[in-house]
């Protein structure tokens, strides 16, 4: 991967663009600190249901970078106000990418470890996701990649498993 920097206002760098080795895929990244939220009543993460959305557009799919610098599908833990894994997945997708969708049961792709719900959707245009909105999103990076280039990134284990399952189909 190689980098190019974007400059805005007062020559202040706010985002970097990362390109794959072939130059066909680009991802936007930004440095930001994870907001600290401490809830003394929160249970251990493995006790919570989690949900995520695999978003594809043609041969590319959407990845977000989390605060630990790993790339993966938009995903997260269910909150008390999430009525179902589906609403959790919709909320996480909006928070991390700005993309608003209404998922159906037909979008359910896999359930992993009995508590991780993965939905899969296709969208007609990559322009439905505004990559320049990254500073307002709950992620530190976002972009579209193809299957071959994705494996050059620091992928989450979950995303690796999803890509392996998709490549076997």
From Swiss-Prot:
Domain of life per record: Viruses
Keywords from UniProt, A to Z, are: Hydrolase, Magnesium, Manganese, Metal-binding
Q: Residues in domain Nudix hydrolase? A: 46-169
MF terms (GO), sorted A to Z: hydrolase activity; metal ion binding
Nudix box, short sequence motif: residues: 76-98
What EC class does the entry list?
hydrolase
Q: Which residues bind Mg(2+)?
A: 92, 96, 138
Query: What SUPFAM superfamilies does the annotation carry?
Result: Nudix
Per the entry, which co-factors are needed?
Mg(2+); Mn(2+)
Task: Give the EC number(s) under which this enzyme is classified.
Answer: 3.6.1.-
Spell out the Pfam families in the cross-references: NUDIX
Which positions, given as ranges, span the membrane?
A: none
Describe the family membership recorded for this protein in Swiss-Prot or TrEMBL: Belongs to the Nudix hydrolase family.
**Which protein is depicted?**
Putative hydrolase 111R
Origin species: Invertebrate iridescent virus 3 (IIV-3)
